[in-house]
């Protein structure tokens, strides 16, 4: 079929398998260009490995460190009538390129919150790798089905205490609007912590540890975002922030546990990037369009891949073997360049000046839209979008 982008709200409902493959190819090339990562882990599990930072982690481990990788994700395969999800095609492409280089790559597709996912992963590790040296936890799901009760809990992207009103961009109409978001109820806050907090990360590490599949010195990392006062009301000071604080709580408990065998657990605070998740958060697209332009001008812009490469090579697995620098909460900070005072001051000054008319001149909004479409495999250089493509792509993946 010939596949064109179709946008509905924050989601592109179509995906392009060849475009997704080309994206992955580019990320691999970027990783290889940096040269091998010294002291890199050789057996890596990535929970949430099909897009964004999770995919970048798997690519970095495999193509930067030569690691055997297991990826866990929840994606849909394509059929002859309908394309699959971008994450399916990303994972298929990763698997193809890893195997071409003789790297071990296996994937599990299903609900990572489930007990079955953890058990199947443990069985696979025991069977193929024995133990693992690193666990990356990169789940970004709006819902969690509780494994014991089957109850489905939903998270909320809402402020706490009062209605939040701010200048935002309507990405469908390319227009500056005033967006208002009602505050979360106590139950919504609690539910957001249940879905997006640190409990499932703990369940994963505890299950892997009890099964004896974590090697001595195993490191685990989970991803977070703090941002700045421009986004705090909806993010860090909102329901989502409460969940991210719970991630810090979990990191402390897990670090204590893993330290007995020479391991570590850290939250890595990353920079804002264009992802399906961030596009759904009011004000984030406008903020990202502003901050990207300034960071590009300053020569410090990074995408997902550059961020994770820096985390591996300059934080967790440094060439001299020294311990990673952390903040007062034991977090790895990769948002340091974004939070530079000159960059943030630029955004603060610019925010009130942006209108629908000057949006494309004052910010990198055009690039934001291009990057958003690229998430789904569209607008990628070197891809013929008028060509007939097969949406059915198979690879080495087992259902959970």
UniProtKB/Swiss-Prot annotation:
Enzyme Commission code(s) on record: 1.3.1.9
InterPro entries: Eno_Rdtase_FAD-bd_dom (IPR024906), Enoyl-CoA_Rdtase_cat_dom (IPR024910), FabV-like_NADH_b (IPR050048), Trans-2-enoyl-CoA_reductase (IPR010758)
Function description: Involved in the final reduction of the elongation cycle of fatty acid synthesis (FAS II). Catalyzes the reduction of a carbon-carbon double bond in an enoyl moiety that is covalently linked to an acyl carrier protein (ACP).
Protein name (database record): Enoyl-[acyl-carrier-protein] reductase [NADH]
UniProt keyword Oxidoreductase, yes or no: yes
Oligomeric form and interacting partners: Monomer.
Binding site for NAD(+): 48-53, 74-75, 111-112, 139-140, 244, 273-275
Pathway terms, separated by semicolons: Lipid metabolism; fatty acid biosynthesis
Highest taxon above the source species: Bacteria
Homology family: Belongs to the TER reductase family.
Catalysed reactions, as listed in the record: a 2,3-saturated acyl-[ACP] + NAD(+) = a (2E)-enoyl-[ACP] + NADH + H(+)
Residue numbers annotated as active site: 235
UniProt keywords, alphabetically: Fatty acid biosynthesis, Fatty acid metabolism, Lipid biosynthesis, Lipid metabolism, NAD, Oxidoreductase
One Gene Ontology biological process: fatty acid biosynthetic process
Pfam family, one: Eno-Rase_FAD_bd
Claim: Zinc is one of the keywords in the record: no
Residues carrying the site annotation Plays an important role in discriminating NADH against NADPH: 75
GO molecular function, one term: enoyl-[acyl-carrier-protein] reductase (NADH) activity
Residues engaged in binding substrate: 225
